[in-house]
Amino acid sequence: MNHAYVLFNVESNSEDQVLKDVRAVDGVQEAYVVYGVYDLAARIEAVSMTELKELVSRHLRMITNVKTTLTLILVE
């Protein structure tokens, strides 16, 4: 399995809805609202790096009110 953390910047006052939408995506293991530079953080997993890339680019980044993401791929 391939694992990553995804950090999200979202539109103001949309955190709760985006969190709900992120948690509904297959491959998302956990997700939380956070304080600081980013608004949400999620831990994701996929069988391959290709699937991990698709999970981020075709699903998570397409959620309404997501402005930017930062993906941290775990290596150990």
Provide a role label for each language-model segment.
Residues M1-E76:
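A compositional/biophysical signature of low hydrophobicity enriched in polar/charged and small residues
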